[in-house]
Amino acid sequence: MADRLIVKGAREHNLRSVDLDLPRDALIVFTGLSGSGKSSLAFDTIFAEGQRRYVESLSAYARQFLGQMDKPDVDFIEGLSPAVSIDQKSTNRNPRSTVGTITEVYDYLRLLYARAGTPHCPTCGERVARQTPQQIVDQVLAMPEGTRFLVLAPVVRTRKGEFADLFDKLNAQGYSRVRVDGVVHPLTDPPKLKKQEKHDIEVVVDRLTVKAAAKRRLTDSVETALNLADGIVVLEFVDHELGAPHREQRFSEKLACPNGHALAVDDLEPRSFSFNSPYGACPECSGLGIRKEVDPELVVPDPDRTLAQGAVAPWSNGHTAEYFTRMMAGLGEALGFDVDTPWRKLPAKARKAILEGADEQVHVRYRNRYGRTRSYYADFEGVLAFLQRKMSQTESEQMKERYEGFMRDVPCPVCAGTRLKPEILAVTLAGESKGEHGAKSIAEVCELSIADCADFLNALTLGPREQAIAGQVLKEIRSRLGFLLDVGLEYLSLSRAAATLSGGEAQRIRLATQIGSGLVGVLYVLDEPSIGLHQRDNRRLIETLTRLRDLGNTLIVVEHDEDTIEHADWIVDIGPGAGEHGGRIVHSGPYDELLRNKDSITGAYLSGRESIEIPAIRRSVDPRRQLTVVGAREHNLRGIDVSFPLGVLTSVTGVSGSGKSTLVNDILAAVLANRLNGARQVPGRHTRVTGLDYLDKLVRVDQSPIGRTPRSNPATYTGVFDKIRTLFAATTEAKVRGYQPGRFSFNVKGGRCEACTGDGTIKIEMNFLPDVYVPCEVCQGARYNRETLEVHYKGKTVSEVLDMSIEEAAEFFEPIAGVHRYLRTLVDVGLGYVRLGQPAPTLSGGEAQRVKLASELQKRSTGRTVYILDEPTTGLHFDDIRKLLNVINGLVDKGNTVIVIEHNLDVIKTSDWIIDLGPEGGAGGGTVVAQGTPEDVAAVPASYTGKFLAEVVGGGASAATSRSNRRRNVSA
């Protein structure tokens, strides 16, 4: 096999016929400015060709079921292995997927519990066991010789009826006695039972005494009883006193409770422990573990309001508001309160009645349109029951969304959120966790953090038989948990829903899964695996990447993290600029040579020739103007109070899983969206948020796509295309033809090409070959019909304008202030290289986030806006971060507030204020470790962020020195 990976003539997207010679079995980092061509080379060229060649080796029948990829625009690639892509976009949104299921650890846990678990009765907690007839006989013969007993077959257990037919049938089969409700009767004269009472009936199969000579007879009697009673036999030891605990002993061929409690499971199989299978799933919630319930906190979001002012939110708007206010006034007459009393001051009895309903009818009075007083009596349902009823009755998606705004996902009341049947939750394994010895169910093990789960399974106490059965399974589980620990995910639990994972967490889970697969000779292409990872955990991620390399694989990592770049075997810097100014190889070689490369912007920042400066003076914080979250207790937050100063740039930091997103996104952003933007979101649990009166708008910028279809693009999303279409409609030619702005839209009939409905391409299905997209023969890819394209603005058609880069378009429309302002903002956030009409699905998460940011930036600022950004540096080069910080600081300089969740030290060190959560992730986090200026936080020994920040802000260290210090720390 060739020891080099050679690429010749790569021209995908903006690549300029790139030639590249890379070592195999190495850790290779692709870096460069955003839009320089890194992903085009790594994913769209090398990975695409590797996957295409592998799929082409399969049969035509197999290929038709696989989503194939088009052949990339490249002359040839040599030394290519089967390729695996690990990106951030394929996060599983299925509510049934968990960390345990996607890593397959849960599959092995199911096998472990099915084969080595100890079942118990969920009612009484007694151990449940199954025995063969021979085991039962041996156990009886081990008792003292001469012990007398009856062999009973329980044929009826706590059932109503007279059972006369059963007595006749048993008598006909040759049995002579039967025990009914503890009393033995002859079958020749059975008792007359009351039909409406529950009874226990056991057939007396035999009377025996313990002695060796009775072994054959005992075996026959036990087998007869087991057959008669569906696998259960009861022995009554007649020499013991009535009511004595050992007078009766129950044996079963199946899983059975010794105290006779019914079990809904016969045999334990791996599927019995699956919440996605009817054999194991809780019947109440079908294995989801949650259900929606009305939350009184959401029904009454502001307890300082009166009922007349709309304290009860579902009854405060619309044409029914007056009706419900009258109803509550009627209730007030009966209970002694009035609707002008704040909710907080209402008697507990009144609040309970409004929420849950009244037992008596209420007397409702009102004035009709003629001014006459009228009255009637009506039932008062209560707002909670009202919402549940409306939710179950409506078929309107809009109304469902409205009612769900007053509900939370709460744990299922039957399984308490564990998703499994009670019988399955009663199967345990004994082990040790955090120094405490005890038995845990599979659900309890999955609730542990991955670190604690690994400790528990390492300390399992198994007998020789169970150890022999479980040895190989435990080896697989421990191995997979070890890989998850290696990539810095020890704070997650196996029960964590996949839909709640960040892109970085999901990517690292897939990375751990790939290491667990043990494949060699594979080409792995990764997209920024360090996203969402604190500097503290970088070392373990780098060790994981090198371990994957050492197995005999080639890794190509698209990355901006300086620690990862420094530890790479080979670095490819693509640039020198972005878009049309990029697409060339600036550097291909080891790290030391990159630092000396004068043409490399990356090398300039890493060597310290360029740097992002720490501000000489930070903005002062006014303690009187703060946004304060009181009693934040969602997920792992421990009832903390956190104040966000207004009018400054605040970074929320902390290790992965410390509670940053929960605090900022789930609580603060949701409350602000509801109060300032009129949204109907469900905030995380908290007591209250103060300081809202200082603000008038929330702008939340995340990395979700700006659109799901190719018809959405930066021009349409920002709204600049509306102005461009208006310009075209104002041309002389358009006026002569009577064209309106709608004529220049590719989404509606009139101006678009109808052959391709405005897509510009035609999809040709090729069955087992990849679908082929060819330019539309009618419009030649221009999207518009011939008549529309005959209209020109300054010599350009509307199609040619959409094909311009944003930088070109900004220059083209410079005289038109209304258009230029939009485009200039896109250039300012580093998107000058993106085409104005570039389809939304082709934009990365970081690019989509910056399009949203630009869309908000061009709006008129009030100086009272709060901007919330979630890791805005994702996908950004050092130089792009500098541009982003200029934009953010411009917002703050106008009096606005910017809150960012961030791990990037360049952003953190330039912040005015830092709120550091932790100290650890998961259960070990959820508290405020430090807050203050970067210098204040750097001085806090308990803060991991402060430790790394001290190397950047402490003692006026230069950028180059601080980076050198950090690399030594990571290497340690």
Curated annotation (Swiss-Prot):
InterPro entries: ABC_transporter-like_ATP-bd, ABC_transporter-like_CS, P-loop_NTPase, UvrA, UvrA_DNA-bd, UvrA_inter. GO terms for cellular component: cytosol; excinuclease repair complex; peptidoglycan-based cell wall; plasma membrane. SUPFAM superfamilies: P-loop containing nucleoside triphosphate hydrolases. ATP binds at residues 32-39, 654-661. Disruption phenotype: Greatly increased sensitivity to UV light, mitomycin C, slightly less sensitive to nitrosative and oxidative stress; a double uvrA/uvrD1 mutant is even more sensitive. Single uvrA mutant is only slightly attenuated in mouse infection, the double uvrA/uvrD1 mutant is strongly attenuated at all stages of infection. Its main location: cytoplasm. Keywords: ATP-binding, Cytoplasm, DNA damage, DNA excision, DNA repair, DNA-binding, Excision nuclease, Metal-binding, Nucleotide-binding, Repeat, SOS response, Zinc, Zinc-finger. GO terms for biological process: DNA damage response; negative regulation of strand invasion; nucleotide-excision repair; SOS response. NCBIfam families: PRK00349.1, uvra. Belongs to the ABC transporter superfamily. UvrA family. HAMAP family: UvrA (MF_00205). Forms a heterotetramer with UvrB during the search for lesions. Interacts with RecA. This is UvrABC system protein A. It comes from Mycobacterium tuberculosis (strain ATCC 25618 / H37Rv).
